[in-house]
């Protein structure tokens, strides 16, 4: 999907103070594409739930999109990229807990799995 595919469509969005929302809005502004903002929420999972209920289209991060995909929520590849980062914060003055290393390994494996799922999108 290109930005122009969202023109005039009802759009479900993250709240205006969300950093990912700002990146999305910036892309639409640069392209001069106007969406019809229908509703805003603080959670990407809530955005997906609202789209499932037919309230409009949305752009959300790939982690949430893949987790929410169902027969009522169709994922489509964007013709452009909006970077999304996941960051692990570790203590500066002490070693991390022993559980951190396996958690980071699991996060890395899940990221690779999500990337593979996204490659198969139309």
Segments from the language model and where they lie:
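Short Pro/Gly-enriched coil loops immediately N-terminal to beta-strands
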Residues: 1-7, 78-86
